[in-house]
Structures are given as C-alpha cells and as structure tokens.
Amino acid sequence: MYTAYKSAGVALITPFHKDGSIDFKSLERLIEYQITNNIGYFVVLGTTGESATLNKDEKVAIIDFVVELVNKRKPIILGIGGNNTQEVVNCINSTNLDGIEAILSVAPSYNKPSQSGIFQHYKYIANASPLPIIIYNVPSRTGVNISAETTLKIANELKNVIGIKEASGNLPQIMHIINNKPKNFLVISGDDALTLPTMALGGDGVISVIANAYPKEFSKLIHFCLDGKYDEAKTIHYKLLDIINAIFLEVSPAGIKAALEILKLAPNNLRLPLVPVGKTTNSLISKLIQNL
C-alpha cells in the first residue's frame, strides 16, 4: 500500500523571475529533469516551494500547471498545512485535488500546541480530508516537536494518516517510531543528510531538497537501501554529503536555488523575507558542484 512513496520524492522549488513572478518555463524544465532522472514523486507547495510567500491564486496556478504537465507520470503530493486547523480543512476542501494523491501537512507553528492539541489537529484534518495525510515534523521551523508517542498514537488511531515526514534530526525518536509503528505506516526522511541512517533503521524513503539538483543519484541511494545494498548507498551518501551540508548553511531553499542556478536549471531568485545565500556560501556550493 502506497508503495510509490517508498522512493525518493522531491520537495519541488518554486522558480521566480527577478520581478518575483512565477517562472513557469523554469518550473517545466525542472519537472521534466526530475522525471527523466527517475524521481519517485513530487511534493508541491511545501517549505522548499516557498508556499508561505505565495497567494491563493498563485498556488492554484502552480497546482494546475504541475498536474497538467506531470500528467500522471509520477505521483503528486500537495502541501497544505498551518496553525489554524479549521482553515487547513477549508483549504483542502476548496482546492481542486484532481491529480493529487496525498496531502503533506506540517505541524502547527508559532502557537505551540500541546501533544494532545497536535493529535486533535491531525484528527480533525484526517477526518475531513478526502485524500490520505502525511504529517510533517520539522521542529526547527515550527517550534514544536511531534513526539514519538504522539506519532504512534496518530499512526494507530487515524487510519487516513499514512505516514510521517520526519525532519526532527532526532534519530532515537525516529528509531522509536519505526520500531513500534503499524506495518503500513510510512516513515519518510525529511533530512537529506540523515536519509541513509534513517533507511538503515527501517525508514521508507525521503522527501528531498537536494533531489532538485541530483534526482538520479538520490533515487539510486534510496533504491540501493531498499534492496539492502548499503555499500552502494553509502558511496552515494558520502559523494553528496558535502553539497547537502552546503545547501543548508543558510536558510533553505536559498542554498538549493543557488545550486540550481549554477546547474542552469532555475534562476536564483527568492521572495522576501528570504534572500539568496551570501557570496561565501555561493562560492562553496559552486566549487562543490564542479568537483562532483
């Protein structure tokens, strides 16, 4: 069940022109590059897609564009989350979900709910959503951690929640989830640098930032892990580790956008309050790419 997500998914960027408008030509080029290089699936309008700086009409335009272009060649997961539970449900219900297979919903940020509040938040969303939900734990951004106990409660009690994107960086927590979860509940790495150890511990795949630039390599890493070929996976892991670390030296997605411009895949433009990486980081990323 949901075996398509036992692979490398890409957390797709949103390319912009210098004037801040959406660069659909670059988005098309990037999507075709991903498909050609065997990416498993797309995650649209997540953190890496700068969804927080897109208005409703822009989000609709991106969804429609991606769904039409992908044309069922790969699964598409849509990011819809927030710290107003009712508004998240309203957004899900008002969005045309044709061509979308699942919803990735980040934990509520800023208002810092209790673990009970987090559970109730996802229960309300799961009961209202016509599509399966993947929860997203990224405490470095949200200010709240979805504990292993809460994740397992969600996994056991909310049947419309099919997995978690785990980006806490907390391997003991991830191990506890993997060791105690229901069989079909997916544990997906949300941290490129920890993908190999997460897979070795029993994880199911990754939603990756670096895959925007290196989809073929990261897809191979995941498939090697799934086949138990960890020596081969380790070779790719260490080959990419320096560039992975470099693109996260400054707030993402600034680093990956710098890399994509160097690779001539997309322009290095972000929307305020995000800005491009500094010269030192950009030079390092450029040097590492040249050495790959």
Residue spans for each PLM region:
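Active-site beta->alpha loop and helix N-cap motifs at the rims of alpha/beta catalytic domains
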Residues: 2-10, 14-143, 153
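A general structural signal for well-ordered alpha-helical segments in protein cores
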Residues: 27, 59, 63, 88, ...
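Catalytic alpha/beta core domains of metabolic enzymes, predominantly
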Residues: 128, 141-248
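Alpha-helix N-capping/helix-start residues
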Residues: 18, 24, 56, 148, ...
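Short, amphipathic alpha-helical "lid/cap" segments that border enzyme active or binding sites
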Residues: 24, 28-31, 148, 282-289
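C-terminal alpha-helical cap/extension of soluble enzyme domains
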Residues: 4-15, 37-39, 48, 207-292
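Glycine-rich phosphate-binding "P-loop"
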Residues: 137-138, 160-161, 271-272
